[in-house]
């Protein structure tokens, strides 16, 4: 016999509704559910999904997460009236014990709309699998951390630093390509040997398995930095070496090493960078080791004088072996004047 309407009672914080043969647009149903006569507790999150059955009739599935536990005694509380005709729709009503499972089930066809911030349920292994599945597919690092904080608070507290590092690495965006302020064609006084090096390397037909780097020594405001950075996609290492993925990419054509003291580079990665070595690992202080793809040349830029000049550094007796190696792996260019004729390019 039919259930007595007076015996209905729903005490749940998460609710799963199914409206069979309901042709009301899902967006309108979402608004209707948000504006039901809620009393003390209010919806924090609502998702409405449309599913078309094999006979062509539409069903609507809904997940509602409330601010607290409901105490609904009206069996018709969730009944909806079609906004453009007199049809009325009564749903199947259940407490959603596993909101992750319900959320995934109702949106398997991908046709849904939602409002509010979904709160991931935690506890069981399967639920935690969903927590991390949702975190990986979040829109940002902050959103992923919020999902893990709600669904697996113990890991969030105990392993926060490792978790933060992993999430930031997962959502790390590659560095933005540098846009040169001057056209490459504006450098009209490039020495022939320097231009030949660039033409040879950037001609893909003549690309060498292990290309030669180049060391350019010249005074300030000769345009050497702007010229070097205008050749194509590159990493720019200025003053020190930084292989953090926020500024360093393995998907560029060359490195520009600008004003990095030769004694510093010797202590770090002289042969790896100038020798265009492949598949090596950084060991710079204060950072975790980073795997470098390599195989690209470096343009080393320096000023003349003690502490800056790579030639003067290599001419020292204690660096004779390094000088011999460098001369086999790099060309030296000494600028006698600016690489441009205009007074605008003074870098």
Swiss-Prot record:
Motif RCR-2 location, chain numbering: 59-61
Gene Ontology CC entries for this record: host cell nucleus
RCR-3, short sequence motif: residues = 105-108
The residues listed in the UniProt record as binding a divalent metal cation, with positions renumbered to this chain, are 51, 59, 61, 109
- Cofactor note (record): Divalent metal cations, possibly Mg(2+) or Mn(2+).
Q: Where does ATP bind?
A: 218-225
What is its subcellular localisation?
Host nucleus
Q: What is its main location?
A: host cell
The entry's active site is 105
- All copies of domain CRESS-DNA virus Rep endonuclease, residue ranges: 9-118
Region Oligomerization: start and end of each range?
154-174
Q: Where is this motif: RCR-1?
A: 16-19
* Region of interest called Binding to RBR1, as start-end residue ranges on this chain: 141-151
Q: Which Pfam families match?
A: Gemini_AL1, Gemini_AL1_M
Identify the cofactor(s).
Mg(2+); Mn(2+)
Q: Which UniProt keywords apply?
A: ATP-binding, Covalent protein-DNA linkage, DNA replication, DNA-binding, Endonuclease, Helicase, Host nucleus, Host-virus interaction, Hydrolase, Metal-binding, Multifunctional enzyme, Nuclease, Nucleotide-binding, Nucleotidyltransferase, Transferase
* Comment block on domains: There are 3 rolling circle replication (RCR) motifs. RCR-2 is probably involved in metal coordination. RCR-3 is required for phosphodiester bond cleavage for initiation of RCR.
The UniProt function text for this chain reads: Essential for the replication of viral ssDNA. The closed circular ssDNA genome is first converted to a superhelical dsDNA. Rep binds a specific region at the genome origin of replication. It introduces an endonucleolytic nick within the conserved sequence 5'-TAATATTAC-3' in the intergenic region of the genome present in all geminiviruses, thereby initiating the rolling circle replication (RCR). Following cleavage, binds covalently to the 5'-phosphate of DNA as a tyrosyl ester. The cleavage gives rise to a free 3'-OH that serves as a primer for the cellular DNA polymerase.
What family is this protein classified in?
Belongs to the geminiviridae Rep protein family.
What quaternary structure, including any partners, is listed in this protein's UniProt entry?
Homooligomer. Interacts with the replication enhancer protein (REn). Interacts with host retinoblastoma-related protein 1 (RBR1), and may thereby induce the transcription of host replicative enzymes even if the cell is not dividing anymore. Interacts with host PCNA. Interacts with host SCE1 protein.
Name used for this protein in its record: Replication-associated protein
Q: Which organism is it from?
A: Squash leaf curl virus
Upper lineage is: Viruses, Monodnaviria, Shotokuvirae, Cressdnaviricota, Repensiviricetes
